[in-house]
Regions:
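Catalytic-pocket segment enriched in acidic/His residues
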Residues: 60, 64-204
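Active-site microenvironments in enzyme catalytic cores
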Residues: 1-107
């Protein structure tokens, strides 16, 4: 019943970085890594008065650049600015306290890597109520009509097992309690010296 310590959290991006299930997750040319992050997702909609309402939950792939993250802990925020995906199912009502799922990468139809993961409040460092409080206490996150997608974290990464994702690999994240798995291929943007060239800036 009391407010707990505030959690660490990072801004992922606006709605333009979300890709639909079965759609390719794009990796920018300047990226150092392309790593899945199998997570539970909470979806929230602010009403006309700015009051957040939890719509439900989904399976998510937060997707991050773990090489950039490890190079400098201050770059963790940078590493999160990547595409992501969630769905295809929406779980409404009470969330089971304990959830067991499987994260998998396939290559040319064969399983390259597979590992179980745990989620649900029984496996989280913070309660959902505490996470929600510390996010929506900021007025800018309570703008009427805004939709918020919260990725609640993971401890299971193929990167930790030295897996290097390649063009055309497919991520599959399953939580049986949610129904169908979330699946996305990965696509790398062209390396046409984009990473070495400064961004063109127009002058007003």
């Amino acid at each position: 019943g009391q407010v707990g310590a505030q959690p660490e959290w990072f801004y992922k991006g606006d709605g333009s970085i979300v890709v639909a299930p079965e759609t390719a997750i794009s990796v920018p040319a300047f990226a150092e890594d392309a790593g899945e992050e199998p997570e539970l997702v909470g979806l929230y909609l602010n009403d006309a008065n700015g009051q957040p309402h939890r719509i439900g939950y989904a399976v998510g792939n937060e997707f991050s650049d773990h090489i950039t993250e490890r190079a400098n802990y201050l770059w963790l925020a940078h590493s999160k600015l990547r595409a992501c995906s969630y769905g295809p199912e929406l779980l409404i009502g009470e969330l089971p306290q304990h959830l067991e799922g499987t994260s998998r990468i396939t290559r040319e139809g064969q399983t390259l890597w597979e590992k179980p993961f745990l989620t649900g409040e029984a496996n989280m460092a913070h309660s959902l109520a505490n996470l929600e409080h510390h996010h929506f206490k900021y007025a800018q996150f309570r703008a009427p009509g805004d939709l918020h997608v919260h990725f609640f974290g993971t401890a299971t990464l193929s990167f930790a097992d030295q897996i290097k994702v390649q063009e055309g690999d497919r991520f599959e994240i399953e939580l049986p309690a949610f129904g169908r798995a979330l699946r996305n291929p990965v696509a790398f943007e062209s390396h046409d010296n984009q990473a070495e060239q400064p961004s063109a800036m127009a002058v007003l």
